[in-house]
């Protein structure tokens, strides 16, 4: 195709050359006038060609332009026909072709100079159109050659040459266009540039024609002269071709660079002259009715100037403050860019100011102020200022981390952005070996891990990255990082932290690091041994966000790549007002509509106020409806639905933690919290027995959301006042429920100030509630720790109602109440107060009424107890007078008579309860009433100080010591008789009458102890604390005596196994008797027959052995003696039993208890009820 085109174009080029030559001759003859006309005509031709190029460029654009814009663009370029009418692209091309054909058909008449000029113009136009058609053909050929990928060098060189010609042609057109606009260039320069472009075009065409001819000639010559061509020549041609290509590309690049500013200038002037076209191009619309004039009419010139000033790089900083305020006051339209830029600058200043004021005490207040402003719009500025402030003052890192934790709980995207920027900052500093930036950024990340904003995996990744390449700086950064977040990491993943410490230990053993860094590693190990005491994860004052409310971000070092720095810059918002209103509504929900700035607590108080205000509004609306006469639904369907959902969740969950999570997801309002707590308590009270599930659940809920603590406190106070409305089962469950809450510190111990324990306000239901409540606390804590807790200074004012100190009557009542429950050790301080207090009338009625309320005995029993006490007082007085009788016989007779009366009066009816705890309570009552039991003494001595004994013990001990003085003196006198004969006689008489005397002595001691206990009850208030040392001495004597008694009693208790031993001996004797008879008969038969005796010695020799025979009379005598002994023993036992009034089983238990538990003995037999005291 190219060859044929070239051949066809060869003859066409001849007349053009001829005409040009003829024109030149004519011009030379005519002179200057002809030359001027030639240049004018040539200029018009160039402009007409530029017109077509501009039209092509405009129509090939990605967006459409209206016809009016096209007309204005092509106004300065005259058409070939001289008309300014616009035609489509195809029509213009057809007209051009017709014009050329017409010019070729008609003969040219070269008569005058003007006609010659016309012909030259026509020939030039023809060549211009041919060039355009050639460009189109060459572009098509180029695309075809790329698809087929021809390897022939001639074709490649041809395509490159065509491309060069096209690029040069376009640059020449652009230059001509610039000259047409007239930017101050001379006419000479423009003419020169046109002539240059012509020459270049002609050279290219000649070159292309030569290349075509060469290619044909080479084919022809190659048949003859193939060996003359060398590969070296081909390579040189290729190199030349590559050089030309590089030079042409460089030329194009330089030309484009030079033309860029000129283009920009032309474009600006063009758009200034044609505003409508520029507006359409910016919008990307083709045929819109709206014009730029209407849009620009809204913005005044003054506002445009202020916008330019405020949106500049300085941001209006070069202006004076007064002028800047004036400019800002003039701008009132919120949708304008100027107003938004001013608002952004103000937000930036607020954020910087608040962050610079942050400290430990003002974190919550400043975060509330920050949340009032639109920090979602200024999140980039907020994160940048926080990071900058932390870098300048690393000592406040934990404060900034607490503030970020609060913001992250409400806006997690802000926390994520800040964490991403910190990670990217750390990675850049680690790559650049910037130690200071690494330290600050890692320090901040560690505190964010402590605040649960960042996941612990990020911390472990940073540690592994630092320790993998153990340099001095890396290990130092890792140590500081571990110190800050080591406590948190050991709680969450102790195994992985242990692995990191092992790596540090290996690095330390290698010894390649600096001594300073090695010492730092040793210090870190010491800190770990101490449990990170000096480096706590979160300070109590900065633990402002609950665990369930925090949003933890799981980021990895590899994933974080983009810091979103665009958010730091100003961006125009089309929906500025709507977005601001949305944020205001959101901030009201977070902070509360009536929240004050000075409120330190974050979240809970504001939410509660808003919820309460909503509830009040609802109540007012209901009242208005009721007054208006509308029907109101009082069935409360919402409350019933809430109860149903809570009850179903409680029964459906397996674990209390799962149940707590489900209940907290319900997002209850503050007005619903009281109802929620009441439902929990009702579910716990309705159970048959107390279940720990409800106590653990409430403890978990109170720790997760502290707003539930106050409702439970109020419920406890209401129950203490309304215990009479509840039955015993519900009272026990509720008391154990609240005891669990106090033990776990879910609610504070200040609640106990509502309980008042006095004789006037004592009710049976309240006493039962207090009893089960305190017993449950003692089971959880233990008596020692419970007493220690009650003696703290914090609870001194709250326990004034339970342990009163104002009135001795109330003091006695509380002492008697707690001793009856079995918690007498709590009232030691009150007992000491009573010793110092003045004397008052004994309150026997108060103690009797309390015992009647708790144990519920009949009135007859209480009257019998009072009579017994009076009788015992009279007997004790007589006993004191008759301590030193002249004869033993009179003494024993009186004691035996008194023991019978004591045994009858000591019978007490046992109380039967459903629970097993009733028997324990009775046993504790018996111990507390006696006050001489060794078990309680041992407990009190172990738990409390040795000097703190009860007042009743000291009084009883002092009285008993005085009574026993006379006896001890007589015993010492009787131990030293004058003659040995008298000693032996007395011993024999004592051995015969040992059992009777032992029983008499024992009974006397019991009578004395019972009388002393009755006296101690009356005189316990007037005892003194000076007899404590004497009590200790007495105890030592009593223990020595009790040991001797135990040995004697053990010997007497051997009769229990005697019957079994006798049976065994009888069997042995029967066997012994039977065997000798057999041997005897056998030997007699052998002797009769004359055979020798079958018995043998030890050496195997037979011998005649005579069997020893017993006489029957001797055997009978021994049996009779044995029977007598047995009868005497049984007679003595029966005699003792008859005196004591016990059955055989009770007597056996009595003897065993005297050996093992000499303090007390309580009979468990159903027939009789008897208690013994040692």
UniProtKB/Swiss-Prot annotation:
Give its localization: Nucleus speckle
Gene Ontology BP term (one): cell differentiation
Gene Ontology MF, one: RNA binding
Low complexity biased stretches: 16-35, 138-153, 597-608, 840-857, 926-957, 1010-1020
Protein origin, superkingdom: Eukaryota
Concerning SUPFAM superfamilies, the annotation shows: ARM repeat
What this chain does, per the record?
Male determiner protein (M-factor) that controls male somatic sexual differentiation. Acts as a dominant factor that regulates the mRNA splicing of transformer (tra) and doublesex (dsx) transcripts and promotes expression of male splice forms of tra and dsx. Probably acts as a component of the spliceosome C complex required for mRNA splicing factor and exon-junction complex (EJC) assembly. Hinders eIF4AIII from non-specifically binding RNA and escorts it to the splicing machinery to promote EJC assembly on mature mRNAs.
Q: How does it assemble?
A: Component of the spliceosome C complex.
According to UniProt, the name of this protein is Male determiner protein Mdmd(II)
Native source organism of the sequence:
Musca domestica (House fly)
Phylogenetic placement of the source organism: Eukaryota, Metazoa, Ecdysozoa, Arthropoda, Hexapoda
User: Corresponding gene?
Assistant: Mdmd
